[in-house]
Amino acid sequence: MSYYQIIVCILASISYIILLEVIALDLGVLDNIFIPKRFAASTDVAIQLPDRNVTLWSRQAVFGKHFTNASATTVINLYLPSNFQEDMSGCPNRNDTDASYFYENDIIDYDIEYIEQKSYSSKPSARVQKDDGGESKDEAILDFLLVQRGKCTYFDKALEAQRLGFKGVIVGDNRSPSSFRLHYMVAPDKVDESKVHIPSLFVSTSSYNLLWSDLLHSYRQPLKLYAKPEELGDMFWPFLLCFSPSIIMLITVQALAIRKFIRTYRTKSKTRRFIEDLPSRTISREGFYSEEEEIENSTQNGELVPLMDESTRRATFGVECVICLESFTKGDKVVALPCKHEFHRPCIAKWIVDYRHACPTCNTEVPPPKPF
C-alpha cells in the first residue's frame, strides 16, 4: 500500500465519520448529549397514524403546555386551516380587527384577557367543519391545527391556534424533505410565555407533507392521531447498533493501513541503512576500472571486498549504470550489491528504497533474506 493509498483511505474514513455525525445530528440522535439548558423542558413526542401504521417524530416547544406522561397516549383530531389553499402558515391576520393585538418589533403581543375569553371557543370558519356541524364533546380528544413554518414566529402560530379554540398546534418544517432535523421552538425575547396554554409540536418536512396529504384526502374529516411522549435521543444505541458493522470494518481497515504504514517505514529504513553501509568505489579511469582505483569503505562487516580484474568486470557487469543508463566516468562513486552488480550510489539507493527491493539486473533480493 503506497502513501497515496494510505492518505486516500484516511480521508475516506474521516469523510465517513463526518457523514455518520451529520446523519446522527440530522435525526436528532445526539440531541440529548448536546442539548442546551434552555431547551431542557422540550421533549420529543411520537405521533402515530393508525390508518398507515406509521410513527412520526415531533418535538415539543419550550413554551406552552407539554406532554409529560410517558405512559399515557393522547388522542388528537388534526385539522387544516380554513384558508389552507392560500396560506398554511397559521399566522394571525394583521387586518383582523376582531382580535386586540398590536405589533412591536415585528412580534405580536396579544391582549391576554381577550385570549382567555376566546381560547376555548373556536371560530367555525377557522377549521374544517365536522359532519354534524358541532364541536367535539369528548374531553379525551384534543383538536390540533396543522400549520407550516414561516411568516411569523412559532409563538405567534401557537397563540393564534389557541385564540381559534384549538387545544394544540403542529408546525411543519418548510425545508428540504430530505432533512429530518427537528427544531426547538422558542418564544421571542421579552414575550410572556405564559400566554400560551396549549402544546405545540414541530415535525419535519416529510412528516408535514404526509399529514397534509392525509388531511386533503380525509373528505373533510379530521385526521386521527395518537401522541405519546418519547425521547428521540433513545435512538442513539439502535443507531449505533445499526452502523456498528460498518464502524467495525472502518476501524479494521484503519488498523491494517496503520500497520502496513509502520511495516513499510521500518522496511525502507532498514533498506536505506543497508545501502548506506555498502562499500563505495571511485572510478579512476573512464569506461573501466584500473588496478590503482581508489577504494573507500572497502570493508563490509569487517571483511575485505575482493576486486575483479578489468576484463571480467567489463564482460560481466558492464561499464554503465543500468538505472540511469549513463556510463561510469572518472570520479563516479559506485556501490556493488551482494550480487556484485554495481550502480551509482544515488541511483541504486532510490531504486531499492522507493521502487523495488531487488537488483535491477538480476532480481536478487536486497537486502538478502536472513537464513533460517
Swiss-Prot record:
Signal peptide: 1-24
Intrachain S-S bonds: none
Bilayer topology annotation: Single-pass membrane protein
Protein name listed in UniProt: Uncharacterized RING finger protein C57A7.09
Top-level taxonomic group: Eukaryota
Molecular function GO terms recorded: ubiquitin protein ligase activity; zinc ion binding
PA domain segment(s): 92-215
